[in-house]
Amino acid sequence: MARVKNTPVTRRRRKKILKLAKGYFGSKSTLYRTAHEQVMRALQYAYRDRKQNKRNFRRLWISRINAGAVQNGFKYSKLIHGLSLANVQLNRKVLADLAISEPTVFASYVELAKDAIANPAKYQVK
């Protein structure tokens, strides 16, 4: 007969994996080996997608800011450059939210950026 090696620890480890695999299709939720493979893959995807989520949101914010800038007759890159010249410390998340929810406020920021590009000396910090 085979020797049993530390059964309580093994059982706990396997139960933990099967608990994580709950809701998976077919044998991936009941058989330890396939469940373990699937859980490891799922955790890798989760790790990868937490990083990608940040990139995706930044892309979304940039496209929203660009759409708002185009509506006001400006480009995204010029808007960001003008806002940095004017020492405006708003991040892209806030700018995208303003472009959607407060178009008049966003338009005033576009005008500020246009003015900062036209008269950079006016906004120089001395």
Curated annotation (Swiss-Prot):
SUPFAM superfamilies: Ribosomal protein L20. Belongs to the bacterial ribosomal protein bL20 family. One of its GO terms (molecular function) is structural constituent of ribosome. Binds directly to 23S ribosomal RNA and is necessary for the in vitro assembly process of the 50S ribosomal subunit. It is not involved in the protein synthesizing functions of that subunit. Gene3D superfamilies: 6.10.160.10, Ribosomal protein L20. This is Large ribosomal subunit protein bL20. The lineage of its organism: Bacteria, Bacillati, Mycoplasmatota, Mollicutes, Acholeplasmatales. InterPro entries: Ribosomal_bL20, Ribosomal_protein_bL20_C. One of its GO terms (biological process) is translation. It comes from the Bacteria. Keywords: Ribonucleoprotein, Ribosomal protein, RNA-binding, rRNA-binding. It comes from Acholeplasma laidlawii (strain PG-8A). GO terms for cellular component: ribonucleoprotein complex; ribosome.
